[in-house]
UniProtKB/Swiss-Prot annotation:
PANTHER family: INTERMEDIATE FILAMENT, KERATIN, TYPE I CYTOSKELETAL 19. Residues 79-114 are annotated as: Coil 1A. This is Keratin, type I cytoskeletal 19. The modification Asymmetric dimethylarginine is found at R24. Residues 248-386 are annotated as: Coil 2. One of its GO terms (cellular component) is intermediate filament. There are two types of cytoskeletal and microfibrillar keratin: I (acidic; 40-55 kDa) and II (neutral to basic; 56-70 kDa). The modification Phosphoserine is found at S14, S22, S35, S40, S57, S71, S394. Belongs to the intermediate filament family. Residues 225-247 are annotated as: Linker 12. GO terms for biological process: epithelial cell differentiation; intermediate filament organization. It comes from Bos taurus (Bovine). The modification Phosphothreonine is found at T322. The lineage of its organism: Eukaryota, Metazoa, Chordata, Craniata, Vertebrata.
């Protein structure tokens, strides 16, 4: 049980509590407050009898030599009302203190329960998410490296194709040049053929002319022989006659030599030109065959490279599609995980804000409790001081 006692000075004083009321005592008089015994929370409060004491000294520090008038019945009604008011206010204070203590206890229990439910608690295990994310990153990195290798291979294949294309264009230009040379040689061959035909025709003409000359010569010889055989030899002294047979023989010999020489020269020139042309044609034909073989090989190589390039491009497109699909799928998963993390962070922020608000409310309630305890201590000091004052007055009266 807790005991409270009031002590009131002779000067006028007033104080208020949470109930909003006030107590006032007039100067020149004092009363002896009874002992107040109250249980926990203001229950079982009992008040003893009170008596009013009048003093002419009017202060605490003055002597007690003045006359003291006492009366148990004086202002008895006022004392009862005052004490009843004090008892009611004290009971109200104690009831409020008890209610605040209960509310404080309830809040502490709620805060403890909330911390147990919403507090840090057992942390959620995201290790399997981390492992999955790490595996996905490794897969993406591997796919990126593989894609880079494929791109490098494609670039190498493109460079090789460009090189082969350049070689092909060079060989094609060489082939066209060789074909142009062959066409030129063909024109030369045609010209040589025409020249050969012309020479053959000239030879035939010369042969015909030679045959005609032979025939004409034979006819003339026959005529001359007939004329010589039928003539009478007459010897006259004259200049020696011209030997026509010898002249004709010499002319025939000269013509035959000239014709044979022309024939041999023409035949030798024709043979030399034909052999040279055949050699050139053979050389160009061999070179043309080699060029055709190289062109065929290059064309076959180019077709193989084009097929390989198409396959590499198809593989690249497939890998790019797979990479895009993988990035989209794992991007969606990462977005879901990020949304989950954002939701958890929002919940954590709400929990922190709620905790801060409850801490502020708790601090506010603690401040109210502290002020109430200070007021109760003030009442206690007032009661104890009033009791000591009345005890001093009682001792002075006894003396």
């Amino acid at each position: 049980m807790t005991s409270y006692s009031y002590r009131q000075s002779s000067s006028t004083s007033s104080f208020g509590g949470m109930g909003g009321g006030s107590m006032r005592f007039g100067a020149g008089g004092a009363f002896r407050a009874p002992s107040i015994h109250g249980g926990s929370g203001g229950r079982g409060v009992s008040v003893s009898s009170a008596r009013f004491v009048s003093s002419s000294s009017g202060g605490y520090g003055g002597g007690y030599g003045g006359a003291l008038a006492t009366s148990d019945g004086l202002l008895a009604g006022n004392e009862k009302l005052t004490m009843q008011n004090l008892n009611d206010r004290l009971a109200s204070y104690l009831e409020k203190v008890r209610a605040l203590e209960e509310a404080n206890g309830d809040l502490e229990v709620k805060i403890r329960d909330w911390y147990q439910k919403q507090g840090p608690g057992p942390a959620r295990d995201y290790s399997h998410y981390f492992k999955t994310i790490e595996d996905l990153r490794d897969q993406i990195l591997g796919a990126t490296i593989e894609n880079s290798k494929i791109v490098l291979q494609i670039d190498n294949a493109r460079l090789a194709a460009d090189d082969f294309r350049t070689k092909f264009e060079t060989e094609q230009a060489l082939r066209m040049s060789v074909e142009a040379d062959i066409n030129g040689l063909r024109r030369v061959l045609d010209e040589l053929t025409l020249a050969r035909t012309d020479l053959e025709m000239q030879i035939e003409g010369l042969k015909e002319e030679l045959a005609y000359l032979k025939k004409n010569h034979e006819e003339e010889m026959s005529v001359l022989k007939g004329q010589v055989g039928g003539q009478v030899s007459v010897e006259v002294d004259s200049a020696p006659g011209i030997d026509l047979a010898k002249i004709l023989s010499d002319m025939r010999s000269q013509y035959e030599v000239i014709a044979e020489k022309n024939r041999k020269d023409a035949e030798a020139w024709f043979i030399s030109q034909t052999e040279e042309l055949n050699r050139e044609v053979a050389g160009h034909t061999e070179q043309l065959q080699i060029s055709k073989t190289e062109v065929t090989d290059l064309r076959r190589t180019l077709q193989g490279l084009e097929i390989e390039l198409q396959s590499q491009l198809s593989m690249k497109a497939a890998l790019e599609g797979t990479l895009a699909e993988t990035e989209a799928r794992f991007g969606a998963q990462l977005a879901q995980i990020q949304a989950l993390i954002s939701g958890i962070e929002a919940q954590l922020s709400d929990v922190r804000a709620d905790t801060e608000r409850q801490n502020q409310e708790y601090q506010h309630l603690m401040d109210i409790k502290t002020r109430l305890e200070q007021e109760i201590a003030t009442y206690r000091n007032l009661l104890e001081g009033q009791d000591a004052y009345f005890n001093d007055l009682s001792l002075a009266k006894a003396l």
